Amino acid sequence: MIIKPRVRGFICVTAHPVGCEANVKEQIDYVTQHGVIEGGPKKVLVLGASTGYGLAARISAAFGCGADTLGVFFEKEGEEGKLSSAGWYNSAAFEKFAVEKGLYAKSINGDAFSDEIKRLTIETIKKDLGKIDLVVYSLAAPRRTDPQGVVHTSTLKPIGKAVTLRGINTDKGVVVDTTLEPATQEEIDGTVKVMGGEDWQLWIDALRDADVLAEGAKTTAFTYLGEKLTQDIYWNGSIGEAKKDLDKKVLTLRDNLAALKGDARVSVLKAVVTQASSAIPIMPLYLSLLFKVMKEQGTHEGCIEQVYGLFKDSLYGSEPKLDADGRLRADLAELEPKVQDAVAALWNQVTDDNVNEISDFAGYKAEFLRLFGFEIDGVDYDADVNPTVKINGLISA
């Protein structure tokens, strides 16, 4: 079939298997060109391994450290002749290239929040890997069923007051104002349950209790802090409460891993285009302006550059970039005053007429489509391709 992008709001409902493979290969090439990460992990579990920062972490571990990896994700396999999700194609491509390199690369497709998937993951580690020395937690989800069977929903809302935000209607390319009503306490609590640190702690406790964490094992969960422009909807909003919960839970995790001489850290990464960030009303405009400024200043980075740098400089670096709260920081270039001041100045100038001139909206759109395997150099999008791609190392629940 010939596959073209079909975008509905902040989701592309099609994905291109050849394009996704090429995108994964580009990220692998970046890592191999930038060299081995000294002292890196050798047996790695990545939770949320199929897209964005989680995929970049799996690639960095495998191709930067020579690590065997087990990935957990929740993706859609297309029925015969139908399209699979981008994350499915990404994971198939990752496995293909990792196995070619002689690395262990297996995957579990299912709800990482569930006890069933935790049990299956532990069984697989015991059988195939023995013990693991890094756990990357990179889950983003709209809802979570907790161990008691209660379904919690996450919400993107401000706290305390309604907020009117500038943004881009990405379908029409026009600047719009969106007013978001404040979250109720129930919505805040639900968001913390889904996107906070509770499930991360459940994972680490389960792995530790099963004795599958190696001495010196590390774990990290990803977060975003941002600056003034994004803080009403992000850090000071319902999602920010969840991210603050990560900061609380990591202290317990760090204490619990001390007996293994291990460590737990929250890692702060810069704003990038992901399926999660594209759903946040303010982010397409913010990212379009940020890309413009950081590209002009020569500091623009995507997921793979961020995560490879995090591994090399901080997770396994001799002088990790830590802030006063003990977080690892890979986002400092975004927060430079000269970057934020330039973005803020453009923010106040942007209109329908000049949005394509003073922002990199074209770059944002291209990055968004790349998530789904489109706009990748060297891919023939007029070619007939087979949408059915198997993941040979898939472990069924």
Curated annotation (Swiss-Prot):
GO terms for molecular function: enoyl-[acyl-carrier-protein] reductase (NADH) activity; NAD binding; trans-2-enoyl-CoA reductase (NADH) activity. Its EC number is 1.3.1.9. It is an enzyme of class 1 (oxidoreductase). NAD(+) binds at residues 48-53, 74-75, 111-112, 139-140, 243, 272-274. It holds the Pfam family Enoyl_reductase. It catalyses: a 2,3-saturated acyl-[ACP] + NAD(+) = a (2E)-enoyl-[ACP] + NADH + H(+). It comes from the Bacteria. The record marks E75 as: Plays an important role in discriminating NADH against NADPH. The active site is at Y234 (proton donor). Gene3D superfamilies: NAD(P)-binding Rossmann-like Domain. Pathway: Lipid metabolism; fatty acid biosynthesis. InterPro entries: Eno_Rdtase_FAD-bd_dom, Enoyl-CoA_Rdtase_cat_dom, FabV-like_NADH_b, Trans-2-enoyl-CoA_reductase. One of its GO terms (biological process) is fatty acid biosynthetic process. The keyword Cell division does not apply. Monomer. PANTHER family: ENOYL-[ACYL-CARRIER-PROTEIN] REDUCTASE [NADH]. Belongs to the TER reductase family. Involved in the final reduction of the elongation cycle of fatty acid synthesis (FAS II). Catalyzes the reduction of a carbon-carbon double bond in an enoyl moiety that is covalently linked to an acyl carrier protein (ACP). This is Enoyl-[acyl-carrier-protein] reductase [NADH].
